[in-house]
Design a protein with these regions (language model features):
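Short, well-ordered coil/turn residues at beta-beta hairpins
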Residues: 43-44, 83
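Structural motif corresponding to alpha-helix initiation and N-cap regions
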Residues: 28-31, 64-68
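Glycine-rich phosphate/diphosphate-binding loop of Rossmann-like nucleotide-binding domains
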Residues: 1-43
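Short, glycine-/Ser/Thr-/acidic-enriched flexible segments
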Residues: 6, 32, 48, 85-86, ...
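Short amphipathic alpha-helical segments
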Residues: 13-14, 53-55, 91-94
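Short, conserved loop/helix-junction motifs that constitute active-site signature segments
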Residues: 69-77
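Glycine/threonine-rich flexible loop motifs
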Residues: 45-64
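Adenosine-phosphate binding glycine-rich loop
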Residues: 77-78, 83-129
């Protein structure tokens, strides 16, 4: 779990889910510290609406920007995911990296939503076995 202290996963989530279910996890405030160990890097933007003051948001907004330089420490088979749209948290230069899977992620998400809507409407084709 990588985040500034101000945005860390709430204690009740860590206690009631991670600890209770014995899910191992590690917390850090530095992306660079975790990068060599990651199978998947799931990023989101630093969300302005989570801050009480504009000053706090501006102070932390650019803390976690993924660049080509930071990727040098990452595994060659790591996947980078992001729900999009992005603000500035992933450099556009990262888009050409083979580990950048966020465009495929968004495309597959669209197909899944289409399939779910068809199922809800009862419009799924019969599947022959």
């Amino acid at each position: 779990l990588i985040s500034p202290v101000e945005l860390r996963l709430p204690e009740y989530v860590r206690r009631d889910i991670l600890v209770k279910e014995r899910i191992p996890y590690r917390e850090t405030t530095r992306l660079e510290d975790a990068m060599p160990e990651l199978d998947i890097l799931y990023m989101t933007r630093v969300q302005k609406e989570r801050f009480v003051s504009e000053e706090e948001y501006l102070r932390l907004r650019d803390t976690y920007i993924l660049t080509e330089d930071k990727l040098t420490a990452a595994r060659s088979d790591m996947a980078i995911l992001h729900p999009l749209p992005r603000v500035n948290e992933i450099s556009v230069a990262v888009d050409k990296d083979p580990r950048a899977c966020y465009f495929k992620q968004v495309y597959c998400g669209k197909l899944m939503r289409m399939a779910l809507i068809l199922m809800l409407l009862g419009l799924t084709p019969e599947i022959e076995e």
